[in-house]
Amino acid sequence: MNMKNKSEKEMTHFGFQNVYKDKKTSLVSNVFHTVASQYDLMNDLMSFGIHRMWKRFTIYRSEVYVGCIVLDLAGGTGDLSIQFSRLVGNTGIVVLADINDSMLHIGQKKLRDLGILNNVIYIQADAEALPFSENTFDCVAVSFGLRNFTNKEQALFSIHRVLKPRGKLLILDFGVPNFKVLHKIYDLYSFHILPKIGKCITQDINSYRYLVESIRMHPDQETLKNMIIRTGFSNVEYFNMTFGIAVLHCAYKC
């Protein structure tokens, strides 16, 4: 292998920038260290609160019940973990895992302030090398996290390994809008308004510019579906929400 091809294989995207793979993790980490304290507020402002509806639908499709063991991966500030903890009850377990300790700290504090103390475990973990045994979880959910992973396929293989047979995968993230007429409006809002909102609230325009760019670099609905199939999952389907701005992919481990 020549040096050029080797270099290309070691590269990935950080927003619209090409960076070395081993650098992306630290760059993404810096973004979320910066935005962690205002993350929930910014989600409400940027989506006009609609992200809560998307997450409710994710929970609805989860098939999680009392006694289940659930992994909320890249779970950040814990929105899904709150709902999962109620579904699994006292005999189940929710593992809230995130590679970023700032986000994990915010999530832990939020859940404890809500009185959720007994059935949620907090673990700092890399999605691409999950520190769990095979066939551990009934359900793994990734909410607005997959696009930030350095190697998405490696993360999906890792998730597949820790899911129980017939366990369910849920991936909630941004997609490509269904209607072309929405693209210009969506781009105008995303590239010109969202970063300014971020700057006003957090005094940090660059982190929110990255978040917008990461959405554009994320695989479209069909591409992600095929990636999930390639990594060993079956019965893969997806649900467009808000005209395809958000998408929930669902799949099962065979």
Curated annotation (Swiss-Prot):
Q: Which residues take part in binding S-adenosyl-L-methionine? A: T77, D98, D126, A127, S143
Keyword field: Menaquinone biosynthesis, Methyltransferase, S-adenosyl-L-methionine, Transferase, Ubiquinone biosynthesis
EC class name: transferase
Please name the pathway.
Quinol/quinone metabolism; menaquinone biosynthesis; menaquinol from 1,4-dihydroxy-2-naphthoate: step 2/2; Cofactor biosynthesis; ubiquinone biosynthesis
A GO MF label: 2-methoxy-6-polyprenyl-1,4-benzoquinol methyltransferase activity
Q: What is the reaction catalyzed?
A: a 2-demethylmenaquinol + S-adenosyl-L-methionine = a menaquinol + S-adenosyl-L-homocysteine + H(+); a 2-methoxy-6-(all-trans-polyprenyl)benzene-1,4-diol + S-adenosyl-L-methionine = a 5-methoxy-2-methyl-3-(all-trans-polyprenyl)benzene-1,4-diol + S-adenosyl-L-homocysteine + H(+)
Keyword 4Fe-4S assigned to the entry: answer is no
Give the matching InterPro entries. SAM-dependent_MTases_sf, UbiE/COQ5_MeTrFase, UbiE/COQ5_MeTrFase_CS
Tell me the NCBIfam families matching this sequence. Answer: MenG_MenH_UbiE, PRK00216.1-1, PRK00216.1-5
Outline what the protein does.
Answer: Methyltransferase required for the conversion of demethylmenaquinol (DMKH2) to menaquinol (MKH2) and the conversion of 2-polyprenyl-6-methoxy-1,4-benzoquinol (DDMQH2) to 2-polyprenyl-3-methyl-6-methoxy-1,4-benzoquinol (DMQH2).
Family in the record: Belongs to the class I-like SAM-binding methyltransferase superfamily. MenG/UbiE family.
| Protein name per its UniProtKB record | Ubiquinone/menaquinone biosynthesis C-methyltransferase UbiE
